[in-house]
Each structure stands twice: as C-alpha cells, then as structure tokens.
Amino acid sequence: MSTSLPLADRLNRPIGVLRLSLTARCNLACPYCCPDVEEPPGLLTLEQQIRVIRVATRLGVQTLRLTGGEPLLSRRLLPLLEAVAQARRDRSDPMAGLQAVALTSNGVLLSEPMGRALRAAGLDRITISLDAAEGEAAARMAGLQGGAVAGERLVRQVQDGIAAAFAAGFDPSRGELKLNAVIQRGINDDQLLPLAALARQRGMELRLIEYMDVGNRNQWTLDQVLPAAQMVERINARWPLEPLGRPRGGTARRWRYGDGAGSIGVISSISEPFCGDCNRLRVTADGQAFTCLFSAEGTDLKPALASDLQLEQAMRQLWQRRQDRYSEERDPAAAASTHAEMAYLGG
C-alpha cells in the first residue's frame, strides 16, 4: 500500500475533508435542496464506503463528514461509524489519522436512543439543520404542507433532536453540536433573531449559510441572497458580537457573543468566496466524486473500487487535476450553468 504524502491540486490546495453522502433521500422537502424521492442506482456497499474513507485518509483527509439527503435514513450509518471507530483505534490503519468524524442531519429522527448510539459508535460532532424557529416559516423552508401547525411540529421535533444530542454527550462548548440555517432574503430572513435565540439557549454555534446556486431545481437568483455581512449586522444589533475570524480551510467566518452565550458563523460563498483554501472532496451515495459543490458532473469511483491501490490512483489523479474556483468566478449576469443537485451532493 502507498504511504505517499498528502497531495495538492493545481492551485496548491491540499485535500483535508471528505464529505460522504449515505443517501440522496430525505424526510423533508426543502425547496433550496429539492431532494429525490428515490435513491440513485448503484449505491456503494458498506465495504466500498470504508475503502473510500481509508484511501481518502491515506491521501490526507483528516475530517470525515457523513451527509445525505438525511443520513439518519441510512441503515448503514451505525455500522459505518462502528467500522471507522475500530479502524481509528488501529495505529497501522490510515483512518487512525482522522481527527474528527461528523454528521449533518435535520434532527427529526434524532431520538435519545439514536443520539446515544451515534455517540457510542464513535461520532464526534453533529450539525443540525433548521432554517426557521417559527411555525409558518419553518413549514415553508422545509417544504411541508399544513402551514404553521406543521412548522411548529417540525421545530419541536428538531428541538427534541438537539436535546437528545446534548443528553448523549455532544457538547456545544467544544464545537460538538452546532445549528445550520440557510437564509433567503424575503423568505426566511425574519428568522435570524429567533434562530439565534434558539441556539443561544443551548450555547450552540449558529451557522448561517448564504442561499447558493447549487442544483437546477431551486430557481436561484442573486436577489434572494442576503449577504453574510448583513446577517451579522442584524444579530450584532441585538446581541453584540466579537470577531474570531475564519481558520484556513474552514468555511465559516466566526463571531462570539460578548455576553458569552455561544457564537455564530457565516458561510458566505456568494458574497465572500473562500475557494482559495477549499479542501473538500465530496463523494455521493452512488460513488460519484465531486471536487466542487458547484460541479456539473462527478467522476465515477466504482470502476476503481476493486482495490485500495486502484482507488488511490483514481482519487489522486482526480485531485491533482482539480482547479475549481466556481464561487470566485461566478457571473450572475451570465446564463445559468448546470450543477448537480444539493441533496445528491450532500451539501
């Protein structure tokens, strides 16, 4: 087996994060994401998923994030976590180099038993997605029928999921439990303060994400983007903030509350792109590798999954060819380009 040093792409960006989607299905229907009802054909097996993770860590990946769709819908989630945890304990295994294993979920299925099982299986961090803290807006952002009643039910379910994660030992003060929210101007930007208040109750970091032109189903337009700077201004006017900056390779520029009640982060891929140090490789549930969230098509890894060596060669060549910097080159005035869908890519 190869023990090569971590590689870099054509813009000298190392590989550092593997985002592995376990499913394209979701139990919500958020309009900006537009998930598929059925899985794509040819899903990776558990053994193939483990091989992808092992080879990625050999190439330099230090963080594994499991995504969807909704990953809690995948029956392979717990077995995969357990296999990764076992490998991390073996110093001879490349996966021993993983510094963090994380999960992104909408939290609806995150019961107390599931929270304990995830923790016991070796999960280090959970990020829960909720785009509104009030009923009508929550239903709208999740694509639910039933208006405010359905939205209020969803918010309660997600709050229960947050409580379950907290009870399982995921500590917000150590960055182990965070809240994500996609913000659209004129759609849910009135939820900034309610979401911040909800996160502050638990001392969680709230990560605010600019509405992005990922996929082709969401009818994205630039005027629906609320720039991150304006999000920060609104929250700072209510609860004063102190800047923390953005770590190299990170997606979020962070602020902490002056009163100590947690922090916020803003992911500003539209208004302040961070392509220059992006270190993420995305692999879909059916084995397509994408070197950019805004890619039109991926590279099928399945033909290379016969051995670690073949897969390493394929992934190394893919990363060495990488020169994506879509967000820095985005031209809103140009005709809309084609992108893979958000739910398929796993965010």
Curated annotation (Swiss-Prot):
InterPro entries: Aldolase_TIM, MoaA, MoaA_twitch, MoCo_biosynth_MoaA/MoaC, rSAM
Pfam families xrefs: Mob_synth_C, Radical_SAM
Claim: S-adenosyl-L-methionine is one of the keywords in the record: yes
Protein residues bound to S-adenosyl-L-methionine: 32, 69, 129, 212
Keywords: 4Fe-4S, GTP-binding, Iron, Iron-sulfur, Lyase, Metal-binding, Molybdenum cofactor biosynthesis, Nucleotide-binding, S-adenosyl-L-methionine
EC number: 4.1.99.22
Binding of [4Fe-4S] cluster 1, residues: 26, 30, 33
Domain of life: Bacteria
GO BP terms in the entry: Mo-molybdopterin cofactor biosynthetic process
Domain Radical SAM core: 10-242
Binding site for [4Fe-4S] cluster 2: 275, 278, 292
Known pathway: Cofactor biosynthesis; molybdopterin biosynthesis
Catalyzed reactions: GTP + AH2 + S-adenosyl-L-methionine = (8S)-3',8-cyclo-7,8-dihydroguanosine 5'-triphosphate + 5'-deoxyadenosine + L-methionine + A + H(+)
Comment on bound cofactor: Binds 2 [4Fe-4S] clusters. Binds 1 [4Fe-4S] cluster coordinated with 3 cysteines and an exchangeable S-adenosyl-L-methionine and 1 [4Fe-4S] cluster coordinated with 3 cysteines and the GTP-derived substrate.
First-level EC class: lyase
Cofactor (UniProt): [4Fe-4S] cluster
Assembly description: Monomer and homodimer.
Family from the record: Belongs to the radical SAM superfamily. MoaA family.
Function in brief: Catalyzes the cyclization of GTP to (8S)-3',8-cyclo-7,8-dihydroguanosine 5'-triphosphate.
Identification of the protein by name: GTP 3',8-cyclase
Provenance organism: Synechococcus sp. (strain CC9605)
